[in-house]
Regions:
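Boundary/linker segments flanking structured domains
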Residues: 1-2, 9-78
Length: 78
């Protein structure tokens, strides 16, 4: 089962977005949190490489806590 890793400042909204984009969405988890986007971006690819996940790079910088999330899925929609 493939897995995906990403970063966001709004985990609830991001989770809902991914639920609509993939089939078999499961095992949503917050892997870590950081004070800056740069710290989260540094952690994200290391985790992805270590566990064989696809990294999904976040969008524009935003204030607040940055969360690194992960989940499993069966396939993308479409």
């Amino acid at each position: 089962m493939p897995c995906r890793v990403g970063i966001t400042t709004d985990p609830d909204t991001r989770r809902d977005q991914w639920k609509s984009q993939v089939v078999g969405f499961t095992n949503w988890r917050i892997l870590s949190s950081f004070r800056s986007r740069a710290e989260a971006q540094e952690y994200e690819p290391r985790y992805a490489r270590r566990y064989g996940c696809h990294a999904y790079h976040g969008g524009a910088d935003a204030p607040g806590t940055w969360y690194v999330y992960g989940f499993d899925y069966t396939r993308t929609r479409g």
